[in-house]
Design a protein with these regions (language model features):
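Glycine-rich flexible loops
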Residues: 1-110
Length: 110
């Protein structure tokens, strides 16, 4: 069972987005009484995966495994007729503007 943290509220996105993303991950692990060492990854609603490991290679391997499991789960839901969850404009804008906006601060520098 892969931990799945809730999505961020509009206020959480607009104030300390990165810290609040970490906060919902911690919140989910505490809520479920999970040991982060036993679960080397988590999904955050409307976000990519977060993974970790004893090395960078282990973290990448965990990310690949998590992505495959998520793909299988998504395909299963679609086959079953479940409706995919949309993304709110405030979150979509945050992801785009923090990387590509006038005041971009996240991602690789050119």
């Amino acid at each position: 069972d892969i931990p799945c943290a809730r999505g961020l509220t509009e206020d959480e996105v607009n104030t300390a987005y990165e810290a609040n993303t970490g906060g919902v991950i911690v919140e989910e692990f505490r809520r479920r009484g999970l040991d982060p060492g036993a679960f080397p990854g988590v999904l955050v609603q409307r976000h990519g995966p977060f993974t970790w490991g004893k090395s960078a290679d282990a973290s990448v391997e965990n990310a690949l495994i998590l992505e495959e499991i998520a793909k299988m789960a998504s395909r299963t839901e679609r086959i079953a007729g479940e409706r995919p969850i949309g993304i709110e404009s405030y979150l979509l804008n945050k992801h785009y503007l923090r990387k590509h906006g006038a005041n971009a601060y996240y991602g690789q520098k050119k």
